[in-house]
């Protein structure tokens, strides 16, 4: 698995991936269903963020992650992920509008062909973009989008 730590300077040979996007802080069954929907004709990638946005916005909060970035990368590699885009969640990324995130990061930067997110996915400054917004913005730029239904475990969404 190739690891990429920014959305800029991505090699042309890496562009065109089909990605699952989210925090994947535990890589549980719900995450795996999102990843499975991203599998297809294009190489499989993951777009995730480090640190977790919650750690960026509330660094004083107690630790909550089920696995650190290294354990997450190892788990994703075992699931057959070919490209891990572990984007730096910093003030620059946090300030992007949903439109700028799709245009600058997903389209111009990573050059993805397909993105899959969970139905509860939020993105952009102030979490102002929804999964539906992502689909609308991506489709306008030629990026196929799939919104995965939430997975339940004993009646509880995970």
Positions of PLM-derived features:
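Nucleotidyltransferase catalytic core that binds NTPs
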Residues: 1-158
């Amino acid at each position: 698995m190739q690891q990429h730590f920014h959305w800029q300077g991505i090699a042309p040979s890496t562009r065109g991936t089909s990605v699952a996007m989210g925090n994947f802080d535990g890589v549980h069954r719900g995450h795996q269903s999102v990843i499975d929907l991203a599998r297809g004709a294009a190489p499989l990638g993951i777009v995730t963020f480090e640190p977790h946005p919650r750690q960026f916005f509330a660094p004083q909060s107690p630790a909550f992650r089920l696995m650190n970035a290294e354990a997450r990368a190892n788990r994703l590699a075992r699931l057959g992920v070919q490209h891990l885009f572990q984007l730096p969640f910093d003030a620059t990324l946090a300030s992007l509008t949903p439109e700028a995130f799709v245009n600058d990061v997903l389209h111009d930067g990573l050059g993805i062909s397909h993105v899959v997110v969970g139905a509860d996915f939020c993105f952009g400054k102030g979490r102002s973009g929804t999964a539906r917004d992502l689909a609308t913005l991506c489709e306008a730029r030629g990026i196929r989008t799939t919104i995965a239904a939430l997975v339940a475990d004993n009646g509880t969404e995970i």
